[in-house]
Structures are given as C-alpha cells and as structure tokens.
C-alpha cells in the first residue's frame, strides 16, 4: 500500500444498454478471464428472463435486490490480550456494494438451473423479495455482529 498519497478510484463507465453504473460494476464482478462480452450476455440474459418471469422492469428488480443484500454491519477479528474477538463494525458504502455483488454472484453459482443467466435471474428475483442464498448470507453476517455486540467497545 502506498504511503504517499491516496490512489484515486477508477471511474467505471455505465453499461451500454441501461446506462447504469451498478450494472456495469456487477458485470465486472461476474467477468472471468477478462471476457466482458460473456459477462454482458449473462447479465442481459438474466434481465430478459426477469422481464419474462416477473413482468417487472429488470433494472428496478436489480436495484431492489442489491439494496436488500447490502450488509449494514460485519465482524472483524481483533486481538486483545492474547484473545481474538469478533468485533462488530459498520460497513462503509463502497464495501457494502462490493460484498452484495460478490454474495449475489456466489449464491447464483450455487443454484441448480441450467445456465448462469437463469440462475442469476432466479437469485435476483428472490433477493428482491427478501429470500435466496445471498439474503441468507447477509442475515448470517448480521447475526454474527448481533451475537458479538458485547465486544463493540473494542472498535478500531
């Protein structure tokens, strides 16, 4: 990590179809080996499926799902006097989005549908309704933070 100056955040250009920066960011999270066109095909395919299945605007479903998955608190290990404590800390906004997208990707990968586009569509629809694997992960993280509330005075 450089000590001299803070490295500026790279600006991510909005995606071509919806003009949304979050969708473009999610495509980057989904992308493997620099194959952006494959990631685009998966995301847009999932959005088409959402429109077919739910009849809702896919961008609204995506925004709602990401909003539901975003964690508010998480736990970080802190060593105090020879013991490790799981200390609950608030998650900064940029990390909230990154975690939500990562959890969404992993939950979609674990589903049983045939194509990744179908899995992603299913996971997005469930997350927008407050269900699904990504929501389960968020609730698990929140439960851990709640259980370790007693150690919050060890904050960094």
Swiss-Prot record:
Highest taxon, organism lineage: Bacteria
CDD domains assigned to the protein according to its UniProt record, in alphabetical order: uS7_Bacteria
Cited InterPro entries: Ribosomal_uS7, Ribosomal_uS7_bac/org-type, Ribosomal_uS7_CS, Ribosomal_uS7_dom, Ribosomal_uS7_dom_sf
Biological function: One of the primary rRNA binding proteins, it binds directly to 16S rRNA where it nucleates assembly of the head domain of the 30S subunit. Is located at the subunit interface close to the decoding center, probably blocks exit of the E-site tRNA.
Entry-linked NCBIfam families: rpsG_bact
Subunit-structure text: Part of the 30S ribosomal subunit. Contacts proteins S9 and S11.
The name this protein goes by in its record: Small ribosomal subunit protein uS7
Organism: Ralstonia nicotianae (strain ATCC BAA-1114 / GMI1000) (Ralstonia solanacearum)
